Amino acid sequence: MRIVLITGISGSGKSVALNALEDAGYYCVDNLPPHVLPELARYLDEAGQRRLAVAIDARSSASLDEMPGLIRSLSREHDLRVLFLNASTQALIQRFSETRRRHPLSGSPSHDANVGLLSSLEEAIERERELVAPLAEFGHQIDTSTLRANVLRTWVKRFIEQNSNDLMLMFESFGFKRGVPLDADLMFDVRALPNPYYDHELRPLTGLDQPVIAFLDALPIVHQMIDDIHAFLMKWLPHFREDNRSYLTVAIGCTGGQHRSVFIAETLAARFASAANVIVRHRDAPVDVDASSRLVTEVDRP
């Protein structure tokens, strides 16, 4: 049986991900107590159901300590995939304010006896981060701070379509001025490279546009940077695989996330297309966010 476990921070998009999996034919359960999961999986497996998706969050806080051992046990018996959704505190506060929904931990006792009840939304969010943090290492993290729901649905579809035996390698471009990605495993700073932004004709374009590609492709220092990152990853990818890592997010950052990081992320994704399942995401590039095939693109293998 294939089991997709969705966890992470409340407000980060778990319901969107669960709905996408339901549309893909999964039997979906929200807020399942962790200790019930093995029994449910056995029951559905015996009934002929081959796809199960479960969302678990801080509402199950009393059982969260059981999750690491449970994940290891289920991984031995099933095709288990763990998706950890995260978002910045600012983005989460905005989402809760817009929906006027109460955070699951609002009004709950603080772990600090001097604080008493968690009175503010920000306190509840930070407490939840502490509770679910141990689960992040078991799955692939997605920072949904800037993602629209339709883009997250597309990413979830990519996630479940990948071969479970392959390493999923995501190259994510971003701009430092908008903050670093929460989901990055490795991060490379390419701000030392010449910036197309200072060419007025290139400024409104992105690293996906041919004039910017031609500008950067003609610079030896850009290729040196790409070669160095490529060599580093080629050396260490086998070690990540030996460590049973199924997912690796490589973040490439420039100032605005529009030109250099986009070009380098695309170039590296093409180089690694035959070595792993590769996805490239451009977090901050001003591309059409409704055209998810550009924002979250699976690189075709040769």
Curated annotation (Swiss-Prot):
The keyword Nucleotide-binding applies. Transmembrane segments: none annotated. One of its GO terms (molecular function) is ATP binding. Signal peptide: none annotated. The keyword Transport does not apply. ATP binds at residues 8-15. GTP binds at residues 57-60. It comes from the Bacteria. Keywords: ATP-binding, GTP-binding, Nucleotide-binding. Pfam families: PapZ_C (PF22740), RapZ-like_N (PF03668). Belongs to the RapZ-like family. Displays ATPase and GTPase activities. This is Nucleotide-binding protein Bmul_0520/BMULJ_02739.
